[in-house]
């Protein structure tokens, strides 16, 4: 069941901003971060904020299946991968959903600081997921998946 949670979380997280943007006049994917969809000024704020909390919960709910699939092969790497996923889920998901940013960056509140710190820590942790997946893949003899994951990690580092 956890694999379905992962697929649902990834798919909806990619689609939802594009589905919500038309309902927020003036919102631009090019000029604004997705978090603005959850700002107090946004007409779709509740949908987006509830989604972020649900995203975090879905990702955390997927971790038992990750452990079942890889924990017996490499408990340390699997534990690190689960930790990285949970830090992202709680920081960029749950905390970001509970505490909103303002549409105007000049206005800083305690909520926007919590949102920012949670998101930064979450995405920083998630940046290491492809490296951990690569190590797990190489350990299992899946060289192609390992190389692909290393390429993703390299792109991640270059673009972060």
Residue ranges and their predicted role:
Residues 1-27, 33, 37, 41-160:
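Hydrophobic, aromatic-enriched alpha-helical segments typical of multi-pass transmembrane helices
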